[in-house]
Design a protein with these regions (language model features):
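Polybasic/polar functional segments that serve as interface/processing modules
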Residues: 1-99
Length: 99
C-alpha cells in the first residue's frame, strides 16, 4: 500500500542537514521542536544529509507514520535556494526533486 499523495497538504524541505541515522521519532522531534510544526498535519517532511546524496521523507497518514529513504549512487539531490526560515515549503503540484 502506498500513500495517497492527494492528501499531502504541503511539502517541507529541512534547511539544515540531518543525521541519517535518525528514524521516525528523531525526525518527528525535529519537526516539532526545531520547526514548531505539527508532524500529524498531512505534510511531507524531507531531510537530507550533508553530501546531499541521501534523503529521508517523513509523513503521517491515518494511524501511522511512513518513512521513505532514497540514496543516490551518483549525483546529488538539488533543491531551490532556502529562505531564512528553517524549512522551505513547496506545494505538491510543483514539487520536484532532481537527481
Amino acid at each position: 500500500m502506498l500513500i495517497n499523495t492527494d492528501e499531502i497538504k504541503n511539502i517541507y524541505v529541512a534547511k539544515q542537514f540531518c543525521d541519517m541515522r535518525k528514524q521516525i521519532d528523531g525526525l518527528a522531534l525535529i519537526v516539532t521542536s526545531q520547526f514548531s510544526m505539527n508532524v500529524l498535519d498531512h505534510s511531507l517532511f524531507i531531510f537530507t544529509n550533508a553530501s546531499r546524496n541521501r534523503i529521508k521523507m517523513l509523513y503521517y497518514e491515518a494511524n501511522g507514520f511512513w518513512l521513505f529513504t532514497r540514496r543516490l549512487e551518483n549525483g546529488k539531490f538539488k533543491f531551490k535556494k532556502h529562505e531564512e526560515s528553517g524549512v522551505l515549503m513547496i506545494t505538491p503540484p510543483t514539487a520536484q526533486l532532481a537527481d
